[in-house]
Amino acid sequence: MRRLAPLAAVVALGLVGCGDSDGGSSESEQQTGPTGESSSPEPSSTSPAASTWSPAPLATEGVAFDQKLHDELMAMFRRDQAGQTGGIDNEGPDARIERLKEIIAEHGWPTFDLVGKDGGDAAWIIAQHADLDPDFQAAALELLTEAAEAGQASWGNVAYLEDRVAAGNGERQTYGTQIGCVRGKAKLATPLTQPDRVDELRAKAGLDPLDVYLAELDKICAREQKRGR
């Protein structure tokens, strides 16, 4: 089964918070951020409500690989990962979101043909972490889904972003990708839409079974607990 990202990167993709309470998350519980603080998303000053933007149509024919744009997205990805793992991020997520909006307005969603698979994954990760701009995050999900339907984006990425948007709204998630840490154990950030079908749906998106994923996240949550986070 294809793995969406190395284990070290899973925290940034699906781990939404750590806590001290017993039991899993419920629909009424407030989502927590990467460091455990309350983080119910509030639109930032750079949200679509404050700065209008319009995506270009998805380009699927006659698209030439853009090395410069690929390299720019990969550099944005590296800065994102530095910020997610406690490193130096002088750019900040708002600037990356605004730049991704500009890219989408000019090119449409960055497709595999345009920027390669790693460049497309980089664009998705920036959208995945746009929690303080939920309107953009939801719009990015629509664009990413359209690209996946055209074979120009990963269905695994769609699954993660779909769950991220749902969990951010306090809604049930489909694939169980969004997780919180509770006493050193991985717990679903919000309940599942179809618990009996989750592994079937995950398989269609190219993801490992949920118990395998949770076992990996358990290791990360245990490490975070030892660090006192």
Regions found by a protein language model. Name each.
Residues 1-7:
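Bacterial N-terminal signal peptides that target proteins for export
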Residues 96-99, 122, 136-140, 157, ...:
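Stable alpha-helical elements in mature extracytoplasmic
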Residues 162-163, 188-220:
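Amphipathic alpha-helical packing elements
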